[in-house]
Design a protein with these regions (language model features):
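Bacterial N-terminal signal peptides that target proteins for export
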Residues: 7-18
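Short, Lys/Arg-enriched N-terminal segments with co-localized hydrophobic residues
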Residues: 1-5
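Conserved active-site regions of diverse hydrolases
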Residues: 29-339
């Protein structure tokens, strides 16, 4: 099987991460050993937003559109099993293979519809060898920033998502991986102070940290509710929160609203430059871009996407998507869900 490829520019960061908690998980107690008969999926079903949004051939769309089939979260994880995840609209759902229902800017309500569409379709029966990958939360937070009731919105969204996931497990799903929001306070979008919100405000809608609690954040509420829904030792659902990994390469944030960015080339702290710059010309559209749509204005070049983090004001480059997916694969291996 193909080993996940880690870009060398992140090697020192990843070595450090290996000594820290690798994921914010539902408890892994009772999980299978990664060395004894690990789970090998024969079908991968993806739901969610741009992290899992692909074309009919399986190439990522909400990123720099390189035409590669492993440049999304779902695509990279599926490649571990030798599977290519393709858009289900142009590839009819079958008993084996890879299929994505994800759309570019999906919120939880859209993911609920995606799951409904899957469960009510021909071949929508869940099988033991199915791996289900859900990525959602970024667009939920973007909407909450513009809302007058963000706390209620986060509460309702996470409840509805857990209910939809329970429909999958009630139908027989035994391997469901959920990737929640990244820390949206560290995106170029957040730097524009949307709706006059500070970086601290936006972070507290995304995640919770010891220094800046976000007890009504999307990720914290989702973790709490999934833990309540799945109390048994051997759980069919794991929440793989990549906030720690993302925070390590997307900058250092503190409560006074100052953002410092880690420069990839030297891993040194710099101002809001370097990898923080989105590489797509139409970056405010938050829709990724084709190679012909890359910004080559200095300091950017036609190959900057190979070392930068952001494709646009929210979506990540293939490099960053692969990094997060590789960390998810590593964690999945520890409890026997990946070879």
């Amino acid at each position: 099987k193909r080993e996940p490829v880690m870009n060398p520019i992140f090697s020192r960061t990843l070595k450090a991460l290996c000594t820290v908690t690798v994921a914010t998980l539902l408890s892994a107690c009772g999980g299978a050993s990664s060395t004894v008969d690990p789970f090998v999926a024969t079908r991968v079903i993806a739901f969610g937003d741009g992290f899992n949004y692909v074309d009919g051939a399986g190439a990522g769309l909400s990123t720099v559109q390189t035409g590669e089939t492993d440049n999304t979260i779902a695509g990279r994880i599926a490649a571990r099993y030798g599977i290519v995840v393709k858009n289900v609209q142009t590839n009819a759902l079958a008993a084996t293979g890879g299929f994505s229902y994800a759309t570019a800017d999906a919120k939880v309500s859209n993911v609920v519809t995606q799951i409904d569409d899957f469960l009510t379709s021909a071949n929508g029966t869940v099988a033991k060898k199915d791996l289900i990958i859900i990525a959602v939360g970024n667009w939920e937070i973007k909407a909450a920033v513009a809302s007058t009731t963000p706390t209620a919105d986060m509460d309702a969204a996470t409840t509805n998502l857990v209910t939809a996931i329970q429909r999958l497990t009630a139908a027989g799903a035994e391997h469901v991986v959920v990737m929640p929001a990244i820390n949206m306070a560290r995106t170029p979008w957040a730097a524009t102070s949307p709706n006059s919100k500070s970086l601290a405000d936006i972070q507290q809608l995304s995640i919770t940290t010891s220094s800046l609690p976000g007890l009504n954040s999307f990720n914290f509420l989702l973790l709490t509710k999934l833990n309540a829904a799945y109390r048994q030792d051997k759980k069919p659902v794991y929440l793989l929160d990549r906030s720690s990994d993302f925070n390590n390469f997307a900058g250092k944030f503190d409560t006074n609203g100052t953002t410092r960015i880690i420069n990839v080339s030297g891993l040194a702290l710099t101002a809001d430059t370097g990898l923080y710059v989105p590489v797509c010309t139409a970056h405010t559209a938050m829709a990724g871009c084709a190679l012909g749509g890359l910004d080559t204005t200095s300091p950017l070049t036609a190959t900057s996407y190979q070392s930068y983090v952001f494709a646009d004001d929210m979506n990540l480059t293939p490099l960053a998507n692969r990094l997060l997916a590789d960390r998810m694969i590593y964690t999945m291996q520890t409890f026997g869900w990946a070879p």
